[in-house]
């Protein structure tokens, strides 16, 4: 059925998209819609509940991770659950946060969905994570391109309890209970907290996340392309609009390939850390801003062997452990070198 519908739709319009069901734990545990007929999927209707036995957010998280492991790409769930009367504020917020790190961000179903009719706290937090999902579209698009070429699924199991990788470089441990506490078993290596990169974790930890925070972490060596146009998330503001923000958490070496979701142009970014940090961009790169997580202020910053002007073309924010490089004629610059104080 799904394959025939999708085939017919494409005959009518080459840009046709259908919403299919990727996973049905009751009837088809091996997967529901065929992968070649599932451009966008959701995991059925959940209730406005937390627990698995009540078909709540726990079920949605489980089924989306299973869908990713089965090879589905763009998958999501009804934020807050589809069925029921009232959506508890804590549940609505946590479900939104989880959905920000899914391929599909879907806000539909029963209950009050007009944020201006809900609490100010819900409006501000849900707005923040809604925009974050939009900002991550360049990363999501490139991750899906990688998956289509035989690479890692956009969502894949990350060990522990309902933990998963979102693309190659983001690790998530969604909150599936009405609690701010989360025990996390981190994958091998060091992981920086996405919303406060001064915090680095490894091994097994029990951490606390207030309602406006969420367990999402950056791999050492991560390079995350983002489209930032507002100041809701903390990753930039309106001055970032029109440029690709490259959020970099340097490791020893990393090489990533990206596809711009608007132009379809391909480019690569490599990072090498030794005495300093060397960043090289190749291909049809977009205009960009570099945001590099660093624990110390640099001595000098070079672009194609020319020293950049501090405060004008680069700035180090000590409180955030973040170096921001926004040089003039940035699209023509191919290589950056960051030298530290000895």
Tell what function each PLM region has:
Residues 87, 116, 241, 313-315:
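Short secondary-structure transition/capping segments
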Residues 28-30, 182, 226, 287-289, ...:
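Short acidic, gly/pro-rich beta-turn/loop elements at beta-sheet edges
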Residues 209-211, 329-337:
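Extracellular interaction modules
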Residues 44-50, 59, 314-321, 326-330:
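Conserved, charge-rich beta-strand/loop surface module that forms ligand/interface-binding patches
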């Amino acid at each position: 059925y799904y394959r025939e519908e999708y085939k017919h739709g494409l005959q009518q319009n080459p840009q046709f998209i259908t919403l299919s069901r990727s996973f049905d734990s009751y009837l088809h545990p091996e997967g529901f819609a065929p992968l070649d007929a599932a451009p966008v999927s959701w995991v059925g209707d959940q209730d406005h509940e937390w627990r698995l036995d009540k078909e709540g957010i726990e079920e949605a998280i489980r089924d989306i991770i299973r869908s990713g492991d089965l090879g589905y790409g763009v998958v999501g769930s009804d934020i807050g659950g589809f069925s029921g009367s009232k959506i508890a504020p804590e549940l609505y917020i946590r479900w939104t946060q989880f959905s920000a790190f899914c391929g599909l961000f879907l806000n539909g179903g029963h209950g009050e969905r007009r944020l201006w009719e809900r609490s100010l706290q819900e409006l501000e937090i849900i707005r923040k994570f809604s925009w974050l999902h939009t900002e991550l579209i360049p990363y999501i698009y490139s991750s899906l391109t990688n998956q289509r070429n035989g690479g890692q699924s956009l969502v894949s199991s990350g060990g522990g309890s309902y933990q998963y990788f979102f693309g190659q470089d983001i690790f998530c441990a969604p909150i599936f209970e009405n609690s701010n506490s989360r025990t996390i078993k981190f994958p091998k290596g060091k992981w920086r907290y996405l919303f406060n990169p001064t915090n680095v974790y490894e091994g097994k930890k029990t951490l606390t996340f207030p309602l406006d925070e969420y367990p999402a972490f950056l791999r050492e060596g991560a390079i995350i392309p983002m489209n930032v146009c507002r100041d809701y998330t903390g990753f930039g503001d309106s001055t970032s609009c029109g440029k690709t923000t490259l959020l970099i958490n340097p490791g020893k070496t990393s090489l990533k390939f990206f596809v711009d979701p608007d132009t379809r142009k391909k480019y690569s970014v490599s990072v090498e850390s030794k005495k300093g940090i060397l960043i090289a961009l190749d291909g049809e790169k977009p205009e960009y801003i570099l945001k590099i997580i660093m624990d110390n202020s640099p001595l000098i910053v070079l672009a194609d062997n020319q020293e950049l002007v501090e405060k004008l073309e680069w700035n180090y924010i000590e409180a955030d452990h973040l170096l921001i490089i926004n040089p003039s004629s940035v699209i023509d610059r191919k290589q950056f070198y960051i030298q530290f104080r000895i």
